[in-house]
Every structure is written in structure tokens, then in C-alpha cells.
Amino acid sequence: MSDNNEKQTLRTVEGRVVSNKMDKTVTVLVERQVKHPLYGKYIKRSSKLHAHDADNACNEGDVVRVTEIAPMSKTKNWRVVEIVTRAAV
């Protein structure tokens, strides 16, 4: 469509691994704070993402950085880029 060869910036987020029970897949909990439109109080909001972990390297409690990819399955369209911090065992 476009003649530009510009690369789109991929969305990357950080979150905590809450489940690694699936093969090559982890569940990542991403928390953010949003401001209430009327009262101005900051509220915690969270979402769970399924991310591809090819090496099965992540454990529960690890903080990871994930990036958006083309869908790999019905629910999995994120990939683990790096493990920021390991969980204390």
C-alpha cells in the first residue's frame, strides 16, 4: 500500500509472571494506573496477557518485558523479550 519502508513501533509492556503451567506460554499480569475522570483519584487497573516463552525460562514471580506480535493462537499474541528481574526463590 505505502511505499515507505518505515518500521512500526511495537508495543512493549512490563509485567509479572503469574502462571507458567503451559508449555512455552506464560501468563503475564500487567498493572497500570488510570486517573478517574470525575474524582481525579488514581485507580489500579490490570490485564492478563498470554505470552510466548520459547525456552520455558520464566518462572512465577519474574518481572518480564513482552512485545506485541502477530497472533500465534486464539489468545496468544505477545512474546517475552527479556526477563527484567528473577523471582526470589
From Swiss-Prot:
Q: Which is one GO molecular function term here?
A: rRNA binding
Q: Which GO terms describe its cellular component?
A: cytosolic small ribosomal subunit
Determine if Ribosomal protein is one of this entry's keywords. Answer: yes
Q: Which Pfam families match?
A: Ribosomal_S17
* Entry keyword set: Ribonucleoprotein, Ribosomal protein, RNA-binding, rRNA-binding
Q: Which GO terms describe its biological process?
A: translation
Task: Tell whether Ribosomal protein is among the UniProt keywords.
Answer: yes
Q: Which family does it belong to?
A: Belongs to the universal ribosomal protein uS17 family.
Instruction: List the HAMAP family.
Output: Ribosomal_uS17_B
Q: How does it assemble?
A: Part of the 30S ribosomal subunit.
What this chain does, per the entry, is described as:
One of the primary rRNA binding proteins, it binds specifically to the 5'-end of 16S ribosomal RNA.
**Name of protein:** Small ribosomal subunit protein uS17
Tell me which species this is from. Answer: Xanthomonas campestris pv. campestris (strain ATCC 33913 / DSM 3586 / NCPPB 528 / LMG 568 / P 25)
